């Protein structure tokens, strides 16, 4: 990654933060848990199609998102996803070897010292609740021993970009300046908790961080 591209991504992060503050009553907590330099993996619950922008604006460092290949290939948005360094992932059923290619891309990003962001649920929540994390985190961490920073996002369920009240993006926007809360938690390493327990532990941490955001919004 060239120095100018890094500068562009840092500038975009600041612009996105301002836009998120305009669109939402946006609060961010625990930014200091992300390392100031070096690689890290951020995991968060997946509520809406705005999640990536909210997380990107709330993070103190640019994030490289792992996202579905069909969305990445959107004719009007592909240039943007490439600019911010998004990492596409395709179904093994449609493209044998796709998972390995994505793991290679994630590993390359981490070894460049980037922060990679994944949504372990693998899809938008259909009901506002956090669903079981899918496999994949272990494969990433088996290749690269980086700190994992859990994050919990609250307030976007109910937006037109979520599945609340019907399919996401198939409804008219009905909320403006809604309260949105993002909480980052202390980082952990794969060595602390191994195997399936790692996923369960991270899921529990993300649930707790989302609950903190829900409580904050309820008391505003």
Language-model region placement:
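A transmembrane-helix-recognition feature enriched in membrane-embedded lipid enzymes
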Residues: 2-36, 54, 61, 73-84
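Cofactor-binding loop segments of dinucleotide-utilizing enzymes, especially the Rossmann-like FAD-
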Residues: 45, 68, 121, 153-154
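Catalytic core of membrane glycerolipid acyltransferases/transacylases, capturing the structured
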Residues: 35-95
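Glycine-rich, phosphate-binding/catalytic loops in enzymes
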Residues: 57-61, 133-137, 201
């Amino acid at each position: 990654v060239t120095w100018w591209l890094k500068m562009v991504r840092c500038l975009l992060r600041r612009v996105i933060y301002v836009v998120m503050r305009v669109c939402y009553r946006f609060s961010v907590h625990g930014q200091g848990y992300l390392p100031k330099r070096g690689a890290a993996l951020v995991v968060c619950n997946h509520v809406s199609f705005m999640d990536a922008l909210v997380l990107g604006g709330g993070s103190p460092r640019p994030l490289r998102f792992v996202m579905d290949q069909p969305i990445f290939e959107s004719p009007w948005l592909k240039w943007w996803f490439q600019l911010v360094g998004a990492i596409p992932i395709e179904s093994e059923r449609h493209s044998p070897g796709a998972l390995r290619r994505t793991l290679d891309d994630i590993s390359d990003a981490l070894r460049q010292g980037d922060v990679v962001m994944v949504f372990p649920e693998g899809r938008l929540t259909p009901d506002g609740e956090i669903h079981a994390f899918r496999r994949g985190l272990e494969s990433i961490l088996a290749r690269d021993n980086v700190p994992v920073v859990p994050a919990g996002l609250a307030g976007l369920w109910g937006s037109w970009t979520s599945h609340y009240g019907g399919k996401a993006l198939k409804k008219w926007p009905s909320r403006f300046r809604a309260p949105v809360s993002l909480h980052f938690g202390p980082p952990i390493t794969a060595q602390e908790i191994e195997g399936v327990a790692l996923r369960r532990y991270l899921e529990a941490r993300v649930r707790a961080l989302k609950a903190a955001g829900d409580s904050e919004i309820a008391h505003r």
